[in-house]
Amino acid sequence: WHDFYHLPEYVRLCATHEGGVPMAFWAQCRDASFLAPMILRPLPASLNASPDWCDCVSPYGYSTPLVAPTQEQLPAFLEAVVGLAQERNVVAAFFRLHPFWELNKGDLCRFGKMVHHGQTIYLDLSVTQDEFWKQVRRNHKQNYQRLVQDGFEVSIDDWAHLAAFTAIYRDTMQRVGAASCLYSEQYFIDLKSILGSSMHLCCVHSRTGAVVAGGVFVEMGGLVHYHLSATANDCLRFGPNKLLIPAMRAWSQGRMNRVLHLGGGVGGAYDSLFHFKAGFSDAQADFYSYRLIVDQSKYESLSRMAATPAGEEQSISTNFFPAYRRPVPSASQLPPVSVGTTVAHDPGVEA
């Protein structure tokens, strides 16, 4: 089993847009195999580290390490990952784990640290339409009915609307301050080229036919992921995105998928985005990251010497990972974004 986050072409696309070199940790032991797609990053110039030093992060999304056919050899694989990473002067590695692919926590914690970021929301597609609507929050239902009455409609896989979706997507990312996800239309064209018939565009149209909300969904192995979404600034008060989920639930169920995964809040936070998604389903899954310090001495040195505006040493953060990449604002800047937010959009790395 694998998800679209593990496709080599997807990892390369992420590396291009997020910065870094696409690579993967791959190993075999007896009849078992291990794969962890990553993006290798140079360290920030402000650290004055050796040019040979680097770190790595998994590509955007739930690109968890895969091990098959069983996890019996997971400790041996993790030991091999650490050994190879040390040879390549990798200081630290950050992995995003998959909510529906659980790795043995005991084995993981022997080598690194698991961090629970919160819950993700999903829809069990085995339930009937009536059972689904019983779970939907009352104000979501009311808003949905009002949108239908006002003539809003949904289209699925009409790619003539990609440019319009991209425009409102970029406006949305600027509105919420997610500069690292400010993808161009070419990104979506490239993503479609990679994923082919697995990628789907769902758009909400006003009575005039204008695209006022939309989402990119990816279907693979019985899972449908709500990957990226947007709402037009001048239509926020109408909540047109409340039409997306019921439409894609019915569509996904009709194609015999098992789960429609909506994801969680920004960085796993229990924020307004999480609240919106939780209004459609009671079903939740845990979202973890896995943090691996490959070279403790280098990691501590870099974390202590991470530059501050005043040129003073910075204490090692126990939350942000890696600590030496923690944003440090100048006196004239706003406070840094939350740890969860940054982790969610931290570019992935493959090594």
Where are these regions (language model features)?
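A gly/proline- and charged-residue-enriched helix-loop-helix capping module
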Residues: C56-L103
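Active-site/acyl-donor-binding loops of N-acyltransferases
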Residues: I39-P42, G106-E131, R255-A351
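Aromatic (often tryptophan-rich) hydrophobic motifs at membrane interfaces
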Residues: W26, P44, E79, Y187-S303
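Aromatic/hydrophobic pocket-lining residues that form the small-molecule binding cavity
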Residues: L74, L78, H140, I245
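A short, internal acetyl-CoA/4′-phosphopantetheine-binding micro-motif in the GNAT/acyltransferase core
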Residues: Y60-E72, S126-V127, S229-F238, V266
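Conserved acyl-donor/pantetheine-binding loop and adjacent beta-alpha core of acyl/acetyltransferases
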Residues: L40-Y62
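A conserved beta-strand-loop-helix scaffold within acyl/acetyltransferase catalytic domains
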Residues: W1-L47, L97-R237, E350
